[in-house]
Amino acid sequence: MKPCQLKQKQKTLAIAKVNNKGKVIQIIGPVLDIVFPDGQLPKVFNAIKINNSNNNWITCEVQQLLGDNKVRAVAMSTTEGLKRGASAIDTGEPISIPVGKETLGRIFNVLGEPIDEKGPVISNDKLPIHRPAPKFTQLETKPSIFETGIKVVDLLAPYRRGGKIGLFGGAGVGKTVLIMELINNVAKAHGGVSVFGGVGERTREGNDLYQEMKESGVINEKDLNLSKVALCYGQMNEPPGARMRVGLTALTMAEYFRDVNKQNVLLFIDNIFRFVQAGSEVSALLGRMPSAVGYQPTLGTEMGALQERITSTLDGSITSIQAVYVPADDLTDPAPATTFAHLDATTVLSRALAAKGIYPAVDPLDSTSTMLQPGIVSDEHYTTARKVKETLQRYKELQDIIAILGLDELSEEDRLIVSRARKIEKFLSQPFFVAEVFTGISGKYVSLSDSIKGFNMILSGEVDNIPEQAFYLVGRIEEAIDKAKQVEKS
């Protein structure tokens, strides 16, 4: 549907439904029962507006039709000030949000309302958050790599264009900086934009991310249209309805950039577990029978409805990076287990690498990708990646021996492996554009071909004479060679 047709339909619906009023008959926390006149029941997922005693409009979403002209809805904000008998207006359509370039550099709530105190968003287009996944005939079926310009990711755990990537890592290991660098690189290298969905995480973290994005230039305060990201927040202090739907709000914004602007989009969801958790809360509030470990019986369906919309089409792509919280480190828990079924790659951040000062602290042995197989990547890429992993794995096995007996007790062959593995480990570090203000080192975007060439030179022994420190925080291999020459001169 064209944007002009969509707007006309929205106006018609708004006029047609303006007299479709119901009455609130029960309020239990964020769940409301509303009765409507005969023949005027709203559809499931329709948005309903209710005016509370403070003259503020509260938006609810219809979840169940109960019979006897009653519906059960879940509020998207707190229900303070609401009372029985309050008038409820059926909008005749799902929650609709502003989309387009006007959303860049702004922060929105689940309803698409700006919450950054920078004034209203004047957008020509609005889209409902509930939309079908692209048809099979519209999908891009040939798998291709989404180049990020980050060596460790592109070489050892490459991302699929239109794929889903799980991001695992504790506090303080560099998740935020990695996310910001990806946002920066997708804008520069692919002419794309990013959408960040903060689902059920801490408000402080959301604020910190926003401030860091402004400092690093990802959000351009002077001209918001030059910003590279739109942000949607439904934080952990908000009702479960908001946390359950804010992921769809972010996804809808991303879909517009893909389908209408025909761009490559990065969609970040932090945290996908909180999406499931919010769905579980809503399910319990609606009185559904719980499933395994107390989760909602519709867990697989809800996750599938979200994930199936994240894909590559013939027009553009949405590549999604999802932070995954694993409750009690139990990978068999239904929430992470359901998420894993949809992932194409995993990026695991290691505290041990961060402690060594190697950033990005991506664990080269724990991170995986379904793209790293012959037939999808080139033979040279596949062989290089396998050899790098083998060398690092052998180094890991030798570390106990080195700690007890020392390096001198190793065979000549093992000493060579250790020397090259240390160079590889250092070379996997990389200066980031968004960290320039902190490190004083200019950021580097490294193409996949340059990454393969560099690691091949280390593996073949061409740079055995260069000290390992020269490989730390450089981009291409040539920079390491130049760095070593400068050290020699000084």
UniProtKB/Swiss-Prot annotation:
PROSITE patterns per UniProt: ATPASE_ALPHA_BETA
GO molecular function, one term: proton-transporting ATP synthase activity, rotational mechanism
Entry's Gene Ontology cellular component terms: chloroplast thylakoid membrane; mitochondrion; proton-transporting ATP synthase complex
Signal peptide: none
The entry's keywords: ATP synthesis, ATP-binding, CF(1), Chloroplast, Hydrogen ion transport, Ion transport, Membrane, Nucleotide-binding, Plastid, Thylakoid, Translocase, Transport
Membrane disposition: Peripheral membrane protein
Reaction it catalyzes: ATP + H2O + 4 H(+)(in) = ADP + phosphate + 5 H(+)(out)
EC number: 7.1.2.2
Residues that hold ATP according to the record: G169, G170, A171, G172, V173, G174, K175, T176
Family: Belongs to the ATPase alpha/beta chains family.
Oligomer and partners: F-type ATPases have 2 components, CF(1) - the catalytic core - and CF(0) - the membrane proton channel. CF(1) has five subunits: alpha(3), beta(3), gamma(1), delta(1), epsilon(1). CF(0) has four main subunits: a(1), b(1), b'(1) and c(9-12).
Role this protein plays: Produces ATP from ADP in the presence of a proton gradient across the membrane. The catalytic sites are hosted primarily by the beta subunits.
Name of protein: ATP synthase subunit beta, chloroplastic
Source organism of the structure: Cyanidium caldarium (Red alga)
